[in-house]
A protein has these predicted regions:
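Active-site neighborhood of HAD-like aspartate-dependent phosphohydrolases
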Residues: 1-45, 56
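Asp-based, Mg2+/Mn2+-dependent phosphohydrolase catalytic module
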Residues: 1-5, 41, 101, 115, ...
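Conserved hydrophobic/aromatic "anchor" residues
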Residues: 9-11, 75, 149
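Substrate-recognition element of Asp-dependent hydrolases with the DxDx(T/V) motif
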Residues: 26, 93-123
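Helix-loop "lid/cap" segments that line or gate small-molecule binding pockets
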Residues: 29-30, 50-64, 121, 152-153
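Short beta->alpha linker loops
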Residues: 46, 50, 88-92, 113, ...
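Metal-dependent phosphoesterase signature
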Residues: 56-95, 103
Length: 215
């Protein structure tokens, strides 16, 4: 595996296994607004384009449902208070990030999760290894637009040359392409090998240590 100078990571399904807390908040919001719950696998399929899109997919009828805004607001409020209930780093992630920092690499998170939750999770799990964490904000286009990744590079003070984006989804592959940087696709997240290949993955790893398996 080529060694880069800057490693920018997706959050959900890449650094953290967040699916059970996301599903719990989705279903709390659906129950609170009189709608049927979703299965864990359904929520897994809905994740990847930010929490508004997650709820749009979870709510029957999406944005056209008159209860959508209430369900969306309930989800956000519930998730802010329950995002740490079962969420944890995937095995090997903390060791990977520590080794990257030991080698003097720059490390950032860029997620489509809303900004407050992204910041909270980064502070809680990776206070000494992640330098910049950017989530969805109204003033900047979310992935797959390049804007949030470019903003992370600006805050780190680095150029695109020598940077790589690491994620578990088609959105991450497209984001890296739009930034003109390589993408490492991971198999421990929310999408499988065939799905990633169909969506253009060119470098796929099954364990975090493979990202630094060779100098």
């Amino acid at each position: 595996m080529k060694e880069y100078q800057t490693y920018i990571f997706d959050l959900d399904g890449t650094l953290l296994n967040t699916i059970r807390d996301l599903a719990a908040s989705v279903n709390y919001a659906l129950r609170s607004t009189g709608m049927a719950e979703r299965t864990l696998e359904e929520v897994r399929e809905f994740v990847g384009n930010g929490v508004k899109k997650l709820m749009e997919r979870a709510v029957p009828g999406g944005l056209d449902n008159p209860q959508f805004e209430a369900a969306y607001a309930t989800f956000r409020q519930h998730y802010l208070h329950h995002s740490l209930d079962t969420t944890a780093p995937y095995p090997g992630i903390e060791k990977l990030l520590s080794e990257l920092r030991r080698r003097g690499k720059r490390v950032a998170i860029v997620s489509n999760k809303f900004y407050a939750a992204t910041q909270e999770l980064a502070r809680h799990f990776f206070p000494d290894t992640v330098e910049v964490a950017i989530g969805e904000r109204e003033d900047i286009r979310k992935k797959p637009a390049p804007d949030t990744v470019l903003e992370a590079m600006r805050q780190l003070g680095v150029e695109a040359e020598g940077a790589v984006y690491i994620g578990d989804s088609d959105v991450d592959i497209e984001t890296a392409r739009n930034c003109s940087i390589p993408c490492i696709s991971v198999l421990w997240g929310f999408r499988d090998h065939d799905f990633l290949l169909r969506h253009g993955a060119t470098c796929v790893v099954s364990r975090p240590e493979e990202i630094l398996s060779e100098e």
